[in-house]
Amino acid sequence: MIDLIPEVVSALCGRAELIDLLGGDYIWRHDVPEDYAEQFPRITFFEMINNDNRYVEDVADASEIHFQVDVWHKAATAALGTEVDAAMKGAGFARYSGADLFEEDTKIYHKALRYRTVRRYEED
């Protein structure tokens, strides 16, 4: 299994244009801290899939890894989504799905973006 969480954090937090649009580094894995429950815009992300891939002689040669990155805002999410996309593509991910959603109960706009990559295992 390959852990790409540090790479995703680095890609998102390291993109100055994204941080500027957010008004700070309001990017969290899974849950938003209670102190920031009303902070918008914000981004959350999580790893969805991390599977063995590319078998050579019955041994996995790589890992296929999927992440979902969610943009949350009280207004349009397009500009933030564009910056997330650039950050993730810059980190070697390909977007395979994107959806514009609206959370009726909270009146929050939500852009759900899904990315995948395949990385080879390092030889020991």
Regions found by a protein language model. Give the residues of each.
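Short, solvent-exposed beta-strand/turn "edge" segments of beta-rich domains on protein surfaces
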Residues: 56-60
